[in-house]
Amino acid sequence: MQAMVARERRVVLARRVITRCSDAVGEDFDGVTAAEFQSLKEAGEFALSWEAHGLHYAIPMAVNTHLQAGRDVLANLSRTTLIHAKDRFARFEVINLTAERGVLAARLAARGRETAQQIAGRLDRATAHLPEGIEPLHLDNSGPLGQTVQAALDRLYPVKA
């Protein structure tokens, strides 16, 4: 996702709010406690929120500022919230990144955030179907990152003749 943002000026990355310790490796996010998350949610600070993997996740309302400025917002969402996102945002595209099971297992293990059992659960869920009504761009991310990024950008921003 960061590679797409680096290559395309029209794209910004949504910074998620997660009930995870802020010093966890991986994505850049705002870590909050469950109580803080609930307070923010009740105050209307989230455009979207959901639960997955034993955590609470949200996309802050700040995404509206980017959308109103004509930028596209790239966000890492759960399958469980895609229909809500489609209903919430006028223009909504889903990029469904997949990778070979061995490649995905190695990437998840390298993050160091989950146990082997949790990784196995993620691998099993990786093949789950998307909700009805979602028509994604399917991309295999098993190979070079640059190739995947270019394929996504070509689909999102086709060259007009």
Model-derived regions, located:
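Conserved nucleotide-binding/hydrolysis micro-motifs of P-loop NTPases
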Residues: 18-22, 80-81, 98-104, 144-145
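Short glycine-/polar-rich loops that comprise or flank the Walker A/P-loop
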Residues: 9-11, 88-93, 132-135
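Conserved phosphate-donor/acceptor-positioning beta-strand/loop module used by diverse small-molecule
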Residues: 73-78, 87-111, 126, 139
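Conserved catalytic network of the ASCE P-loop NTPase/AAA+ motor domain
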Residues: 65-68, 86-89, 130-132
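Conserved beta-strand scaffold positions in the cores of enzyme catalytic domains, especially
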Residues: 13, 31, 49, 74, ...
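A conserved segment at the C-terminal end of the G1
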Residues: 1-9
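NTP-dependent small-molecule kinase module
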Residues: 106, 110-114, 128-161
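ATP-dependent small-molecule kinase phosphotransfer cores
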Residues: 17-73, 77-79
